[in-house]
Swiss-Prot record:
It comes from Bacillus licheniformis (strain ATCC 14580 / DSM 13 / JCM 2505 / CCUG 7422 / NBRC 12200 / NCIMB 9375 / NCTC 10341 / NRRL NRS-1264 / Gibson 46). This is Small ribosomal subunit protein uS2. One of its GO terms (cellular component) is cytosolic small ribosomal subunit. SUPFAM superfamilies: Ribosomal protein S2. GO terms for biological process: translation. The gene is rpsB. PANTHER family: 30S RIBOSOMAL PROTEIN S2 PROKARYOTIC AND ORGANELLAR, SMALL RIBOSOMAL SUBUNIT PROTEIN US2M.
Length: 246
């Protein structure tokens, strides 16, 4: 059975590309036709590519790999946060801070600062500090949480990135490519598919389309994790049986 159906893709508007004047010729192989000045994406190809992305993500997660979800455009922010959290992965859904990957040590220092202020808030330090200082610390905490909250438990570089709109997230794409980190991407008709390792040709502007495809990647991760849990349970049961028999 397919990971996703043509009906689901149609209902979510995944097939609507950009206006014909705003296109990347490299996306030609994923375009079915043109209608009223808009390119229509070939959903048969999208079905296959979603399957490919699903299996890639599932296999990576089964090996203990970590995936960073990236989507800072308004249509993607909520889905990226919800689905990354649901699958126990990391996310960036506000501004991508330059150097998030390529200057990882500096980013880790900012994350440490975020955690230090959180501790101060929790252990009562705020209660003994001057009010003015507390106000400044709270503002700093809010800003750090906004930009780094989704990666504050990311102790090392991710094993892959899942990106919504690589054109919008071109800095993230450039950093991942520089470090040879594979990229899975929702790629619309105005994007360059050559920059992405696993291309999902799809509408990257419709909230429903973004939600549907992002949730499928989270499902792949959860399926891999459930497989791990089942294997662990079976191993424990086998051990118990052996002990009892002995």
């Amino acid at each position: 059975m397919s990971v996703i159906s043509m009906k689901q893709l149609l209902e979510a508007g995944v097939h609507f590309g950009h206006q014909t004047r705003r296109w990347n010729p490299k996306m030609k192989r994923y375009i079915f036709t043109e209608r009223n000045g808009i390119y229509i994406i070939d959903l048969q190809k999208t079905v296959k590519k979603v399957e490919e992305a699903y299996n890639f993500t599932k296999n990576l997660a089964a090996d203990g790999g970590k995936i960073l979800f990236v989507g800072t455009k308004k249509q993607a922010q909520d889905s990226v946060k919800e689905e990354a959290e649901r699958s126990g992965m990391y996310y960036v859904n506000q501004r991508w801070l330059g150097g998030t990957l390529t200057n990882f040590e500096t980013i880790q220092k900012r994350i440490k600062r975020l955690k230090d202020i959180e501790k101060m808030q929790e252990n009562g330090t705020f209660d003994v500090l001057p009010k003015k200082e507390v106000v400044q610390l709270k503002k700093e905490l809010e800003r750090l949480e906004k930009f780094l909250g989704g990666i504050k438990e990311m102790k090392e570089l991710p094993d892959a990135l899942f990106i919504i709109d690589p054109r919008k997230e071109r800095i993230a794409v450039a950093e991942a490519r520089k470090l040879n980190i594979p990229i899975i991407g929702i790629v619309d008709t105005n994007c360059d598919p050559d920059e992405i390792d696993v291309v999902i040709p799809a509408n990257d502007d419709a909230i429903r389309a973004v939600k549907l495809l992002t949730s499928k990647m989270a499902d792949a991760i959860l399926e891999a994790k459930q497989g791990e849990e089942s294997a662990e349970t079976e191993a424990k049961e086998a051990e118990t049986t052996e002990t009892t028999t002995a």
